[in-house]
Amino acid sequence: MTEIKKLTKIVILYYGIAGVLFAFIYLVFTNFQLSTWPYDDPVSFWSLGNSLLVLGIASFFAYFKSEWEHIKLYFEIMLMWDFGSILMDIAIVVVITLPEVWVFQMILNFVLLIFNLVIGLYCYFKQRS
């Protein structure tokens, strides 16, 4: 069994905090989000908030594990979620005409997701070595 490295633990904790924080924004401040979004569909915001909440809580569970093998699948799912979200953000910006405030938010999301993916991949490959 391989012990989880300190940086990986920090990244898992970061994923948890970020997941719960963004889940709170999407679940609680849905009306604020919808006020500038081009489509009136709260369900998509709730679905995103729910998935972020689940991933955030799973991060906290993973943080308290001590063996890499116990959290490897979770970590791979997080990396796939980041990658899929990056592709989705690109598609949204290309396909939908967004107000300027949302273009800025999508760019910010893109930067955060790239950061998440890069640091996650770094930890993943360091953990395997």
Question: Where in this protein do the model-derived segments appear?
Answer:
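Alpha-helical transmembrane segments of multi-pass membrane proteins
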Residues: 19-29
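Core segments of alpha-helical transmembrane spans in multipass integral membrane proteins
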Residues: 17, 21, 42-64, 77-87
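Non-cytosolic membrane-interface motifs at loop->transmembrane helix junctions
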Residues: 35-44, 72-74, 98-109
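Cytosolic juxtamembrane helix and N-cap/initiation of the first transmembrane helix
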Residues: 1-18, 125
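Juxtamembrane "helix-exit" motif on the non-cytosolic side of transmembrane helices
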Residues: 27-35, 64, 90-98
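Membrane-interface helix-boundary motifs at transmembrane edges
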Residues: 1-7, 64-72, 97-100, 128-129
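Membrane-water interface at the C-terminal end of transmembrane alpha helices
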Residues: 111-129
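Membrane-helix boundary connector in multi-pass membrane proteins
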Residues: 68, 87-106
